[in-house]
A protein has these predicted regions:
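Right-handed parallel beta-helix
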Residues: 160, 164-165, 169, 186-197, ...
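Hydrophobic beta-strand segments within extracellular beta-sandwich modules
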Residues: 69-70
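Pro/Thr/Ser/Gly-rich low-complexity, intrinsically disordered linker/stalk tracts
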Residues: 1-21, 86-92
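Recognizes extended acidic, P/S/T-rich segments that occur
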Residues: 27-64, 76-84
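Acidic Gly/Asp/Thr-rich repetitive segments characteristic of extracellular carbohydrate-active
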Residues: 95-140
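Extracellular beta-strand-rich solenoid/capping regions of secreted or surface-exposed proteins
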Residues: 9-10, 22, 128-136, 147-164, ...
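Hydrophobic loop/turn residues within beta-sheet-rich immunoglobulin-like superfamily modules
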Residues: 20, 61-63, 178
Length: 356
């Protein structure tokens, strides 16, 4: 129930259910109006017939609709037990060139359009109002371009949001001063954004998809974070694509290290599952990438990552390290630069399937 990414790529969706004890036949009801499906009778257009099997194939369901269905079961004596109402939506690409495990993110489709009308940190017409005002699914578009200086962290917690940075006029939007990311967002689309945190005295990250599910970040440019440029710890069904993560501040009083310690971290990537492709990591001291699969609730190695067709340039003392349970690592290009002191780009140190 509530599968919002049902696979109808072959032109149909097969629904299945488990028969109740004593059920002799199953009445199938399906449509795009929940109230009509819930109240439908055998004379309603939503009624698709009675059958003994426990699967039903819906041919060419619209990708623009939510489909509702129920199964009424009849026993040998003719007694009918009405079924519960179930729902699904057919999956489709977030946008034409979306790839990877987050490619079916809904974003704000079918919801409201919210306009960012100024570059203020908060208040009416601000980006913060558009993000934090929980009004349901929405697409955030921009009537202004320029620099938004945040006074506190800006986090997307809601689901079904599209951040359409490509709508900003001129050179687009730059977010500076604090982190801009997610915490538990589902079905989110973030595109064409620039994040330049800068030195503020706080150990800010740059951006990320922390805790997100069925979400995608595309054409983002991120630099000058204190901790790390990007993080996706705890995420599921993610894509980071066609993004630049560069020039993290390297000796900038990171709160977890003694003064003068180099940090300048590019990205810690987690996900179950996550895709990271066609990205550029440049001029970062470390974590290019750091695989943050971690451990699951039972203590076993976690994280399934596809990492392909990325470029890593001019890292410092750390290239790619960390750990994950399953990794596809294909077609990535590493080029040393003037800052490079570690000349091993990737070292597969341990293959384990048990607990960490």
């Amino acid at each position: 129930d509530r599968d919002w990414h049902a696979d109808g790529d072959s032109g149909y969706i097969t629904m299945s259910w488990k028969a109740a004890s004593g059920a002799a036949s199953h009445g199938v009801y399906i449509g795009t109006d929940s109230a009509k499906v819930e109240k439908a009778t055998t004379s309603s257009p939503e009624y698709k017939g009675s059958q003994t099997g426990t699967t039903y194939k819906l041919v060419n369901p619209s990708v623009h609709k939510t489909w509702w269905w129920r199964i009424d079961e009849k026993d040998a004596s003719g007694r009918v037990v009405p079924g519960k109402l179930w729902a699904f939506e057919r999956r489709r690409l977030a946008f034409p060139d979306a790839e990877g495990y987050g490619r079916y993110a809904h974003g704000g489709r079918g919801g409201k359009v919210v306009y960012v009308k100024n570059l203020n940190d908060a208040g009416a017409g601000s980006l913060r109002e558009a993000v934090e005002n929980s009004i349901g699914p929405r697409t955030i578009v921009f009537e202004v371009g320029g620099i938004i200086t945040l006074k506190s962290r800006l986090t997307i917690n809601d689901s079904r949001i599209t951040y359409a940075g490509q709508t900003a006029p001129g050179k687009g939007i730059v977010i500076r001063g604090c982190s801009f990311g997610t915490a538990g967002m589902k079905d989110g689309i973030i595109r064409f954004n620039k994040v330049r945190v800068g030195y503020t005295g706080n150990t800010w990250d740059g951006t990320g998809l922390t805790g997100a599910d069925f979400s995608i970040m595309d054409h983002v440019s991120q630099s000058w974070a204190i901790d790390e440029g990007f993080s996706s710890r705890g995420g599921k069904n993610l894509t980071l694509q066609r993004t630049m993560i560069a020039e993290q501040l390297n000796v900038a009083n990171h709160q977890n290290y003694p003064a003068g310690t180099a940090h300048g971290y590019a990205a810690t990537i987690g996900g179950d599952v996550g895709s990271f492709h066609h990205n550029l990591l440049a001029h970062n001291e470390g974590r290019n990438w750091s695989l943050g699969g971690g451990l699951d609730a039972a203590g076993y190695y976690a994280g399934r990552l596809d990492i392909f067709n990325n470029v890593v340039y001019n890292w410092g003392g750390r290239a790619t390290d960390g750990g994950a349970h399953e990794v596809n690592f294909v077609g990535n290009y590493y080029k040393e630069g003037a800052a490079t002191t570690q000349h091993t780009t990737l070292n597969a140190q341990l293959e384990g399937t048990g607990k960490g």
